[in-house]
Amino acid sequence: MNIRESWWEKYKSYILYAVLLIIPIFVMDSYFSSGKISYAQNTDGLGQHYAALQYIREYQHKIVNGIANGTLFQIPHFCYTLGQGADPLTTLNAYDFLDPICWISVALFPNRLTRSYKLMIWIKVFLSGEAFCLYSNYIRKTDGWRTAMGGLLYSFFNIEYFFYFPNFMHGCYLFPVILWSIEVLMKENRKAPLAAVTFYSFLTNYYFFYSNVILSMVYLCIRLRCKKSTVRENIQICKNVCAAYLVGGLLSGVVLFPTVHAFLNNYRIGLTTGYIESPFLYPMNFYKQLFVHLGKFHGMFAYLTVIDGIPLGLICLFLLIMQKGNQWKIMKIATVSSLLIMCIPLCGRVLNGFAYAANRWSYPFALAVAMVYVGLVDKLCKLKKKQLIVLTMMVAIYMCIAHSIGGNSSDGYSYDVLLLLTVLVLWAVNTVPLFKAHGNLILGEVTILSVIVGICVICSSAYGNYIKEFMSVDDLNAYYTTPSISKVRGSAKQREFYRVEKREANLNVECANQVRGTTFWWSIMDKSFQRYCTDLQLNTLAMNCELRGLDGRRALLDLAAVKYYTTNSPDNEGVPVGYKKIEDGLYGNTHYLGSAFLYKNSILRKDALKMNPLNRQEAMLQGVVTDAKIHNIKTIKPKKRMTALPYKVETKDVDLTKKRISVKKEKGALILHFKKPMKGELYLWMNGLKIKEADKSMCSLIFGTSSDIWCRGQKKGDLRVSDYEKKSTEQSPYSFWYAPRDGVTYYLGKSEEGYDSVKVVFAKPAEYTYKSIGVYENDTEKYMEDISKLTPCRNISIGNDTVSGSVECSENEVLFLSIPYSTGWSAKVDGEKTSIVKANGMYMAIPLTPGKHHIQLKYSTPWLRAGILTSLMTISGILIYQVIRIKRRSKSAEHETQIRL
């Protein structure tokens, strides 16, 4: 064999896979392009993944501008466009913030981000198949054609889910590489590949490396169980694997340590949500559906389980059952184990970071099926008639059982037809001499055809209608270039620090436009931030990681340093009290306190919690609310600022009792009639409102029972339909994103708008329990009295990582800063270190003595220094180890030479 032939044999599978991938890419992209549809899914893709790419683009612009101007660009550790302020290194890590693929994709199309997003996805799909080829070629030397087909099967097994969430592809394309590096370690005793892939995994997306570590350990146990070696050898292999993981983890300490800190301080950790009936068994209907989806296109169903297989893969699984001998033992164990992981809720919960049980980890099963395909597809061309009959019977039995359970009609029986055609092809390949000589080629063509048919079924409007889950290019651009944000974007470049509240719930639009706003939708939400929202029972807390702004409540807007209120609607209804029109869609705060002001009094949080949540929010303007007493600061009892309004209830398709709300039909409603309030803001409080789980036994509990509730103020004789409605999403604990709160509050508008009733509309039939329902108004005069006692500090300058300025106090006072609390902040007053107090639930405060003071605050990512030090020490250790190793080798070589002489 000459050099050219050996090169071709070595890289044949990689090249063939890359060429074959063009076909499904063209087919799938044609569905998107023909309808001018982007690759951004209309929930997470729109609000998170696409926003993260926009954030990366802004960083690239700053880097380029910094180089052009001859100044070094320093990535800020703290960013005020992530919610009200967060650390980008930790908040965006799960969204591929440090992934080179994302940065390259954005750099190639900086002005066409939809193309960057598309390129990023297809690169990761491409890498998934290439990673499979790498692993498969090392495990088993087979024909490159079969390996390439296996790579194609593996890439598209989970394609339906990965287009929704591009960051989940990390697990898919890195998992085979991790297994390959483990095999290299076992056979060649080389730890470097595993350490390197560990480092890269932690750097780009720690979340999926965590799950891959667990899955790879399961794989290692299976390999050692089937490997003929001594106990001592197995222990040594385990030590080497752990050592490689440790070195890789320590190398990535600069990213790993801060993200671990953020994860531990994340509200969602340990939160029991999702399916909780049993740690070991899902509802029986889930297992029935799992069985059906093994032979079905459009395979996403309960608990985020995705199986988009092809008929030939299913037939290979049936053939695996028929195989005998130790050589198939490991493959059988791996396939069964990967399937069992999806069948046990506890496994889903552990792999998901001890959060809700989910099956995002179906790619190990996909890998097992693809490996079975590569190992057995050749045998499918050499079947005896008896084996053909048995396989045909197994297929027939499967189809009968699947149809008796629920059938495969949702894909137009396309999978069934293709499965039967595949069986006919197998008969032809094994019995007709004309086809026998080209069996592998024919089955490869059947594989490609199956992938194409699967894509067509999933994307077809008649069956899967997958495309409807994605945003059109025009709608995507409109979402991020909303006029209301455009009006304030230029203002955001001013040196003055302020935030913007918008009426529309375009989540993370502020982040993408580099405007400081109030919405937040990222997986990691600090505990303090969440506690703030649940203490106030905000209706805008839609999920345990999603906040749709501050509901236009004047007190909360003042505390958050909101200077402008924007809306795309020409209707002035719902504009917060105290905001004056500047131009259409833009309103300014007439009593803007600024980002820093002084309190004379403090309130203990335990005292504030004794009040209802509406009085609680007003109390934060009477005194700074803290967990403990502040030395030398007067502690007061908060006064009630809310007045309850008596009302009469009218129901529509709703049964109402003292403790229960039973909604009978869609858009059932409660109408609360009251006397017109004369001043202030109008609020609704549904105390203790909880939605009851509809049916705990059903497989449909993907997200648990949930329903939207809309509220709006009304006035008699006004027949127009206003688009100004306040919304909340009530979820049962079975929902993945359940946020426990003891009720919900809504701001309905200014009392001067003349409302005399509140209409509460329930989106769909459901059962609710509650403690009480109240309509409240606050007193504008009392509000102005409270804020007049607060002293704005105009000489405070807020940068990305620093706060500095001068403050003059007439007595012992507390400096309040509208910056989210974090242990990463440190403070100095007149050059001396001082403590920072968590204030009003989520912000920061510094106690001050009488006189003039110079204030300095600096932010450093928590645990970042320890991470940097660990990474540097690990690099030094590796270099020292390599130097010693090289010296030992040279001495050993010299010694051998002397012996020979």
Predicted features by range, described:
Residues L21, W103, W122-I139, G144-K227, ...:
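Membrane-embedded helix bundles of polyisoprenyl
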Residues L82-G85, T91-A94, I452-V473, R489-L559, ...:
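Extracytoplasmic/lumenal acceptor-recognition loop(s) of multi-pass membrane glycoenzymes
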Residues N189, F208, I330-L346, V350-Y480, ...:
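Contiguous transmembrane helix-bundle modules in multi-pass membrane proteins
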Residues N2-E9, L53, K640-L901:
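Active-site-proximal, structured, solvent-exposed surfaces of multi-pass membrane proteins
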Residues I101-V106, R516-K664, H673-K675, E681, ...:
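A cross-kingdom signal targeting lumenal/periplasmic-facing segments of multi-pass membrane
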